[in-house]
């Protein structure tokens, strides 16, 4: 039987959903898995953007597949970086998950996130997870350079 995130434990849960993410950018010195990411600065300007997606407001899971939602949650941030003529480099993800979601479901969400990261050569360098009384909330911060 599939476990939910509270049964697995925070650190095991994070390791499970992010195990296949790889660092692609040389500026990303330390990625997900520690207290903080380490990103090397350059002479370029850093762009920072954040978008929050809340179930029932920004998406409806009755017709939005979780993999598509994961992809979309990354792309809405990257579009802000591209709008400033920048090159996206890293993302940080925060998710609030209710107990109705099993780990398998969240892994499906992260498949979409991973697909977007691979396509646009973005590094997932950190994040946070917490429980939610109802629904799913996704918060992504994207960093880029211009």
Predicted regions and their residues:
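Glycine-rich anion-binding loops of enzyme active sites
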Residues: 43, 53, 89-146
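Extreme N-terminal cap/leader segments of soluble proteins
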Residues: 1-65, 84, 93, 111
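General structural feature for long, well-ordered alpha-helical segments within catalytic domains
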Residues: 9-13, 34, 69, 73, ...
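Short beta-strand
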Residues: 28-31, 77, 128-129
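Short secondary-structure transition/capping motifs
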Residues: 62, 66-70, 98, 102
């Amino acid at each position: 039987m599939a476990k939910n995130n509270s049964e697995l434990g925070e650190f095991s849960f994070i390791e499970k959903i992010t195990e296949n993410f790889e660092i692609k950018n040389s500026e990303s010195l330390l990625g997900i898995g520690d207290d903080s990411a380490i990103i090397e600065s350059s002479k370029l300007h850093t762009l920072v953007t954040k978008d929050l997606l809340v179930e029932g407001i920004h998406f409806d899971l009755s017709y939005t597949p979780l993999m598509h939602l994961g992809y979309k949650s990354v792309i809405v941030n990257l579009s802000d970086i591209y709008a400033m003529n920048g090159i996206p480099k890293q993302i940080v993800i925060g998710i609030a998950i209710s107990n109705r979601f099993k780990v398998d479901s969240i892994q499906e969400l992260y498949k979409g996130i991973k697909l977007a990261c691979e396509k646009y050569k973005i590094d997932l360098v950190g994040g946070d997870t917490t429980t939610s009384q109802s629904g799913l909330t996704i918060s992504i911060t994207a960093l880029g350079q211009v």
